[in-house]
Amino acid sequence: MAAEGASDPAGLSEGSGRDGAVDGCRTVYLFDRRGKDSELGDRALQVSEHADYAGFRASVCQTIGISSEEKFVITTTSRKEITCNNFDHTVKDGVTLYLLQSVDQSLLTATKERIDFLPHYDTLVKSGMYEYYASEGQNPLPFALAELIDNSLSATSRNNGVRRIQIKLLFDETQGKPAVAVVDNGRGMTSKQLNNWAVYRLSKFTRQGDFESDHSGYVRPLPVPRSLNSDISYFGVGGKQAVFFVGQSARMISKPIDSKDVHELVLSKEDFEKKEKNKEAIYSGYIRNRKPADSAHITNDDERFLHNLIEEEKEKDSFTAVVITGVQPEHIQYLKNYLHLWTRQLTHIYHYYIHGPKGNEISTAKAIGPFNNIDIEISLFEKGKTPKIINLREIQDDMQTLYINTASDSFEFKAHVEGDGVVEGVIRYHPFLYDRETFPDDPCFPSKLKDEDDDDDCFISEKAARGKRPIFECFWNGRLIPYTSVGDFDWCAPPKKRGLVPIECFNRISGALFTNDKFQVSTNKLTFMDLELKLKDKNTLFTRILNGQEQRMKIDREFALWLKDCHEKHDKQIKFTLFKGIITRPDLPTKKQGPWATFSAIEWDGKIYKAGQLVKTIKTLPLCYGSIVRFFLHGDHDGEVYATGGEVQIAMEPQALYDEIKTVPIAKLDRTVAEKTIRKYVEDEMARLPDRLSVTWPEGDELLPNEVRPAGTPIGALRIEILNKKGEAMQKLPGTSHGGSKKLLVELKVILHTSSGNKEIISHISQHGGKWPYWFKKMENIQKLGNYTLKLQVVLNESNADTYAGRSLPSKVIKFSVKEGKPEKFSFGLLDSPFRVGVPFNIPLELQDEFGHTTQLLSDIEPVLEASGLSLHYEGITKGPNCVIQGVVAKGPVNSCQGKNFNLKVILPGLKEDSQILKIRLLPGPPHQLKVKPDSEVLVIENGTAFPFQVEVVDESDNITAQPKLIVHCKFLGAPNLPVYTVDCSSSGTSILTGSPIQVQNIKKDQKTLTARIEIPSCKDVSPVEKTIKLLPSSHAACLQIFSVEEQKAIQIKHQDEVTWVAGDVIRNLIFQMYDEGEREINITPSLAEKIKVNWTPEVNKEHLVQGLLPDVQVPTSVKDVRYCHVSFQDDHVCLESAFTVRPLPDDPKHLKCELKGGKTVQMGQELQGEIVVIIADQYGNQISSFSPDSLSTLSITGDGLDSSNLKITLEANSQSVSVQGIRFTPGPPGPKDLCFTWREFSDFLRVQLVSGPPTKLLLMDWPELKESIPVINGRQLENPLIVQLCDQWDNPALVPNVKICLIKASSLRLLPSNQQHKTDDKGRANLGVFTVCAPRGEHTVQVKGVYNKSTIEGPTIKLTILPDPEKPIRLNVKYDQDASFIAGDIFTDFMVSVISESGSVIKNINPTRISMKMWKLSSGMSRPPANAETFSCNKIKGNDKEDGCFYFREKTIPNKVGAYCIQFDFMIDKTNILSSQQVIVDVLPNQPMKLVPDSQPATPAVSNVRSIASRTLVKDLRLSITDNYGNHTGMDLVGTVVATIKGFNEEDTDTPLFIGKVRTLEFPFVKGSAEITTLVLAENSPGRDSTEYFIIFEPRLSTVSGTLESYSLPFMFYNDVKKQQQMAALTKEKDELSKSITMYRSLFDANKQLVDEMKCQAEEAKLKETQLRNELKAYNIDIPATQQTTHIEALLEKKITEQNELKKRPRRLCTLPNYTKRSGDILGKIAHLAQIEDDRAAMVISWHLASDMDCVVTLTTDAARAIYDETQGRQQVLPLDSIYRKTLPDWKRPLPHFRNGKLHFKPFGNPVFARDLLTFPDNIEHCETVFGMLLGDTIILDNLDAANHYRKEVVKITHCPTLLTRDGDRIRSNGKFGGLQNKAPPMDKLRGMVFGAPVPKQCVVLGKQIDLIQQYRTALYRLSSVNEDLDNQLQYLHTPDMKKKKQELDEQEKSLKRIEQKLGMTPVRRCNESLCHSPKIEVTECPIPTKRMRRESTRQNRRPKGDVPN
């Protein structure tokens, strides 16, 4: 075969060959196939490079030898005609062309086409990426076949119908050697495409340029579910590799659609080897082009099967067949023997291509569609056997089918990876059902575990379900990649700690991942390259798919909740019944405490266990016998439920022995034990119980009751026995034979009774030792005084309980007392300190026994006192309770006033501890003597000096002593006015006694004798000391004199003299002299010169002072300044001074000076008020009289803008000054003005202030341009306050206060607050405030006017453009399908309602409960909905609802009755205002024709077969119409007939009456929806049985109706007797009347019953609502009394509202930055208004930190931001949210950086917290989190800078530290920089209101919730009262006499009807009213509440015509 494919077939190329292109020419090969006699071979034609189509055609004609006039076409092998347009593009070197009569001509004989299939360079590039290999015990052969199926799937992807792929295993030896054929009905391949297929590694992406096929380049398919795009033939490798993996040779046969030719290519290993041997081109060959079903070239017997295969080509439009021969023997055996296995594997690989995106859901029938139209069929042909044919669609045990059909629920998700990478995923849950796992087993992964004896709960072993298999199988473009699986993701992996569900639930999930082609797979499609790595990348985004829509949510939380729901709903093992409630179990760990559902019974393994039932446990230590208390099941359950586990609470039995409750797993109940066995065990255990104690004292020291004992007396050892009632000793409680019983212990307690309570001082527990009894050792430690109790108590071993099962265990009590012993030691009591030398003191003693108890001294004892260095003696010692050593006196030296420490030893002979050391501090005694130094009696001093005396105060032991008020005085005698010296020796006892100098006046040369007396006035007992003083004259300075030396003559300047001198001159030659007390001149020494001071100069030349010279004096420049000159001398003895005054005189004229008398301001246009005074002054400004009247003419005045016309200049004679008046300026800018005054050579300048003139106009401050209209939203405030400024006529601000300002506006424009008069302030401004504007849409004007001095000042006109409010609803927009028809009883089309604002935009975020739909039947004059109009609520929003802010009314039932109905939609704006839509009028049309009915029910005829026509008349004037199921007339367009037939009650009865004319049927025409039955008469002497009921069946026969219409049946009575017929006719008439009356009665009673049921439902619902709200109020500690509820609620509500209003009125921090107008919903507002902060310090620092962003306006869209930008000319900052990169935004739940992996890395101080966590958002929380997350990032706030620095220093050790702020206002930037003004927040007042506001108090929010609840409760209470009142009224109405009478009448009429029917002989069938017969069945539950829709439909169907029921 291989040789044939490569050789020259049938001589087709005889005489031809390929020489290739020569010298730029192209070689073309031509086949002439115009007729049968054409040449078989091809012709080679050389085509010039520059040839055109005409020349080429001429060359063809010449080469073939045909006329150029002959008609023919030249085509490619793909039948593409060569024309002048495509010649250059198509005719290339080596191309094969056909000569045909027409393009679609059949190929009469086969041709060959030369091809090259040199492998693509990717062969080397990707050579290492491909090989088939076995994995995990799997044979790779199915995967090789899958490669061929991939190609077929791609080929059939464009099929509109069935995509058929056949794999034929041709193993019948009679037909040739084994072969495998893969055939599909795809689009086939052209010869060029077949050539491309042969090129190795030519993938679909590289088929460009030279490899370009007939089709365009690769186009990626559109996304489809599960990526089932059939785009899986990818790399140009798999098909060829698969072929040569299966066999040695491949034959490719293909026919493209719309092609006349079949293309065939053979590749074989043998042919390749032959070409290599012959040195031929290996990668070249021929494609055979032939007509379909032509197998003439198949001559090899080994390939006989090809004839049949080729024969099948006739029936195919397009196909491709891959025939593999030379199949490996091992492959043949595998394909034969393991057919089911590898077909199952193929089904697994292509599961979703075969069954569609949902997979093989066996329970769901599927129609052929785009996702399940693939048939893959496997055929096995063997010799002598019937062919086996398997369709993969029929295989039901592939793993995906098992996964899908054993799963109870699924969790769908989607992952987005690296842009376009999309992975769809599904997780399925396989529940545990009753006794086994339902997770399917995979033969490749056996996971069944051996049964193990589980000692725990009913949980199965952890890996029992899925085992070790990974969760996810992976599909690429919908096709399984078998060797790649993903174990799990972080969010679906079993948690390390127990979560919401048991851990085994994670092993009950399977899953599948479906990727698109953005993920790389190996070229053999066995493995993914990096799927798991990409999916587990941190940037991969997982979303959940709900209802086909992606939803962004936390995938881990959603999965955990889904898994919990699956576990609770689908896992079933134990049935829990008799639900009791939900509890928490505080005895368990916190995470497991609740919720727990409690039940009273379970059903398990066919048995029922109930509360109270006796049970026994197994596998517990010990075994438990007891009664069931209840069952626990973890979770929030309600009602009966199945679960896999649970616990049972058991009360141990007998309870007298085991007063204990145990909880064990349900699995540990013994299901085999009999109940009588448990009861016998309980009875046996009740016998043995302890009764009393036996106490003995084996070692003596017995304790007697009520004994009094000295402290320390021992209590002897105790021996105790526990005796039962039989007197038997026992050591333990009786226990079961199956477990350890509880030991008994004896507890001994000694209790001391004190005033503060009982105190347990001894507590011992003794246990029985087996060989020795209960024993307590001797007790010798009872030493405290008081009353005692010794108690012996039997207790339990573990719990130490003294009761068991409610009974006290035996005990024994002995009471006794303890008193003090004899004295053994002593201590000192509280001493009265201080201790002083020679002063007696007492020493109190406290005597104690050996245990420290206080006792008394009874015997005579002489104390001994000893102390080193002291002499001691005492008076005596007292006995009795208070022992004191009295009158102790100590004497001796103590060295200092602070005293000295001594150890005083006290000895009491005769005591056990007879001595104690008392540490005392002995202080000096009281003053006794005064010592004065110097010791000399006569002392000599100089006058004016002080004398110091050294004084000491000593006690009797010569110790210097001190005491309070110890003051020593020294008085001098012998002269007047002598000082007195005092010194305080209170602290030290010694000091220097001195004082003021002794100064005696007029002591010149003689000395003076004085006496000094020194004494202590406070101590009269201390003798005074006297000294004699001799006083000499002083040698210190006593006099200072000043002289002025002029011309060698010194003139004395006396003290306080005045000296006149020329202003500004200097006084020189001043000298001074000093004299002492003896009038002796003192020589000035440098030391004395240092002490001389002058006041007119700070620096004095010391050398001049030594010479007696004083500094020069500078005379003041102003004659008004008088200078005071002072000279002083001061030393330690004296202070001398001498002073004089210098008065200046004026100098010569020098300057001209001007002075303004009056105000400096000049009002524009007015003269200067006041005058200007001009004077002449000297150089220092002193005025000089120089002016004269003649000299005034030379005075000139100039200035900028000065108006000199009114100047007045006058001379003031008295002051010698010039007065200037009449200063005025020309109008100009206000400001300072300079005036220049000039006289002779002198000039001066004067500045005045030019101010604005009188007010004449008004201007607006800080207001936009008035040329443009200002936009403002209706009902909103203006952006800026209205501030008015008064101005003069030249537009200068006029500072005039109290000018009245008012606004002039149109009446249609309303300003709030209302128009009030305002007055200007001191600056001429008036702030009218910020107005709220309400006006119609459009432009309005407002004018400002003022009143000044009774004249009007016109102000500017403000133009306002009123914009609609985007948040104010004005109308409802209703959308629905207006072309829809409304059929009675059907479902309305969907209504989509949106609330439209004034601006025309849709208002979003509206509570759906505020939207309602009302419907009522339209009647004349009714425009408003009636009270009984039906009301509907809107439906929940679905996932695919695109429009936000829209409300949907879906599936609302159309009324049953036809007519015009009105639909109106209402929006509740608030409690009083409702906005209604335009009414929608709908015409309800009748439904489908269903039955034939009469217009009015005729009476039951009674006829006979007599001659009289009246007696034979059945019907007279009967009109029959077609109606639908609801009684609406329909079928007006129907045409046909109504056939009347008489039938008997028995179908077999043939003796039925006949119509007139002896016919059985009559036909009546049916037109325009009805048939008129004018007269229907029986035939005379008609057959029929007497007194028999017959029926006339009126059957409609209408040609245009599909289906059968219900016929109308009219009963009638037939009689043979005329008289009887007349009687029966009367009875029939009466029967009809009774039937009608009964029907109306029943309708009445049924309607009343339904009304009562509905009222009961409403009452119960109202009661439940009231109870629910009452409980919610209790949570807020609000109790509602049982009586006077309404009064209490109203008072409580008023109180809460008052409290809330008071809280809201409290002042709190506000942001005063003006917000931006929210003219649309896309504007959120300025950042400063979006958040609030409670803490003032945090608000200050965060506001400062964001200061540059606070006035930025945040918008949702860039368009809205751009609009604001344009409106404000770019002045306003804007921030659109749709431009924020959200991946870098912080996670608001992220912990602070000092937490690492959930652990505290270091302990911070300063209360760190993320700044963003301090923000609260009143609105738009999600958007605000985005904004502030971007602005603040991870900024942290702490208390102070120290805390912040410490925090940063620690954080940077582990991670990056964000910006830190402190509550003190400091900032540390993220780079660590802090300090400076730019990092320090200013005070709050400096932020100018640009600060975040404070939220309302939390209590205000709580009050708001309480008020809302109270209002709801008030409404619910009113509702409950109203409903109960209506129900009571209705029940009373049902028991009224009138209703009882009607009930009685109904009973009587039914009895009468029954009698009449019996008389008539009619079948007693109750024919109820038609509407009642078809009323829906309503399920009866515990609460008789039908569903809302059922009630509505039932109410409609039971409507009856108005009118009274006949009485």
Curated annotation (Swiss-Prot):
Residues with PTM N-acetylalanine: 2
Effect of inactivating the gene: Defects in Smchd1 are the cause of the MommeD1 (modifier of murine metastable epialleles) phenotype, a semi-dominant suppressor of variegation. Mice display female-specific mid-gestation lethality and hypomethylation of the X-linked gene Hprt1, due to defects in X inactivation. Mice do not show defects on telomeres length. Male mice are less affected, with some surviving to become fertile adults on the FVB/n genetic background. On other genetic backgrounds, all males lacking die perinatally. A subset of clustered autosomal loci display hypomethylation and derepression.
Gene Ontology molecular function, alphabetical: ATP binding; ATP hydrolysis activity; DNA binding; protein homodimerization activity
SMART domains assigned: SMC_hinge
Pfam families listed in its UniProt record: HATPase_c_3 (PF13589), SMC_hinge (PF06470), SMCHD1_S5 (PF22899)
Annotated SMC hinge domain residues: 1721-1848
Modified residues (N6-acetyllysine): 1350
Function: Non-canonical member of the structural maintenance of chromosomes (SMC) protein family that plays a key role in epigenetic silencing by regulating chromatin architecture. Promotes heterochromatin formation in both autosomes and chromosome X, probably by mediating the merge of chromatin compartments. Plays a key role in chromosome X inactivation in females by promoting the spreading of heterochromatin.
Protein name (Swiss-Prot/TrEMBL): Structural maintenance of chromosomes flexible hinge domain-containing protein 1
Lineage: Eukaryota, Metazoa, Chordata, Craniata, Vertebrata
